[in-house]
Amino acid sequence: HHPGHGVDGLIIPDLPYEEQGELKAALENVSGAPILIQLVSPVSKERIPMLTKDAKGFIYCVSQMGVTGKGANFHKKIREYLLEVKKNSPVPVMMGFGIRTAKDVESLCDIIDGAIVGSHFIKLMKENNYDTKAVKDYIQTFKKEMNV
């Protein structure tokens, strides 16, 4: 958490693992700097241990390839991929990209520790004149549907 800024972690979608070293080192050398959240895409099983070993905070599992916000069109081997990440992860495993409803993730709740809803929140805010009540109501409904 960076004092006064409220930033606990950074998610940088297109930063390859092999190019993270310099940024990670810089963040680790600054007191109170945010952590770098590791993104893991549906990749070959062999890369998953490397991608997860130094994770901090949580792992952001990308549920599908392409652009976020287009709906739940998850990778065809989503369960196998998530199980492999979970098996190797030292931190909670969250899944995001294309999640709009509890139904989108209910069949994966036995594997993931949480769901990340991003683009849909932005859409709700825009549709409701940036009134946070719409997002709060959405979260309550989502939680109720997930029995959380």
Go through the PLM ranges and name each one:
Residues 122-148:
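C-terminal helical cap(s) of enzyme catalytic domains, especially alpha/beta-barrels
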Residues 3, 24-31, 79-88, 139-147:
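Surface-exposed amphipathic alpha-helices with a cationic face
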Residues 10-12, 36-39, 59-61, 93-97, ...:
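Hydrophobic faces of well-ordered beta-strands that scaffold small-molecule active sites
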Residues 11-31, 44-50, 68-83, 102-105, ...:
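Active-site-adjacent beta->alpha loops and helix N-cap segments on the catalytic face
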Residues 2, 51, 108, 118, ...:
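Conserved, mostly hydrophobic/aromatic
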Residues 63, 87, 100-108, 138-148:
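Expand to "…catalyze enediolate/carbanion chemistry for C-C bond making/breaking, isomerization
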Residues 5, 54, 88, 110-111:
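Structural motif
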